[in-house]
Amino acid sequence: MTQTVPYRCGRIAVIGRPNVGKSTLTNALVGTKISIVSNRPQTTRHRLLGIATFPEGQIVLVDTPGLHREQKHPMNRLMNRTARGSLEDVDAALLVTESTHWNEEDTLAYNLLNDTGIPVVLVINKIDRFKDKSALLPLLTHINENHTFATIHPVSALKRKGLETLVSDLLALLPEGDPMFSEDEITDRSQRFLASELVREQVMRQLGEELPYATTVEIEYFTENTGLFRIGALIWVERESQKAIVIGKGGARLKEIGVKARQQMERLFQTKVFLETWVRVRKDWSNNEAALKTFGYE
């Protein structure tokens, strides 16, 4: 008699310091890009659910902003609050760090998770940086001597290495139950939100070190017609000088932002996209909690 394996479903928070690859890991587990990524810290600013569905179960990943000690800036406070709030009503947590080192912000995240009493799985990301995996031994020794985890997984989210065992262990931590979302759903966020994030991703990528910290994107309009989405995106900065940086000489940089963002949207939405972009100034919006909330910061 064949024994049926019970279906499992639950929520898992993805926690860690900035720039360790939390969103890349979420995208890899979901199987498609739903969270934007860049080399800049604090790329992720909002909570987002990534829905990873497998024959054995469904993992609902709660991708979060990076935890950090600096909380003087209102935007940082709100992002820390969002990350901490993601621990409500989850069945387990993924603590993501990187293969090169463990620092004080990793300890901050560990202590936060340890206080919840939920199972915590450690993911050591970016192992593709090492040809000789024995180079990880000092870090693993330090972690094992000072911290306790349900399981530890060295992975490369970018190269999709080590994910099968991780998925198996995550499913084992979840309760038995029916899926929360249908099989074809990949996130709880709207296409409008995803469009704004894809524009912001390109702002970060195209500006690099010139990027003003206080840059955000608001969708002015989003209309769906058969075979075509029409989208208007406002890129907000705090100074006229920052506006000039985003636009670039003769509008070249803004044009490149629009072209690359449109290509990403067409790939995600599976339809043609007409995208317009503008840059506007709202002085000191990132220091005003009321203004932050109008831009969707929770």
Curated annotation (Swiss-Prot):
InterPro entries, per the entry: G_ERA_dom, GTP-bd, GTPase_Era-like, KH_dom-like_a/b, KH_dom_type_2, KH_sf_prok-type, P-loop_NTPase, Small_GTP-bd
Spans annotated as G1: 16-23
Region entry G5, spans: 155-157
Keyword set includes Iron-sulfur: no
Role summary: An essential GTPase that binds both GDP and GTP, with rapid nucleotide exchange. Plays a role in 16S rRNA processing and 30S ribosomal subunit biogenesis and possibly also in cell cycle regulation and energy metabolism.
Similarity comment text for this entry: Belongs to the TRAFAC class TrmE-Era-EngA-EngB-Septin-like GTPase superfamily. Era GTPase family.
Full protein name: GTPase Era
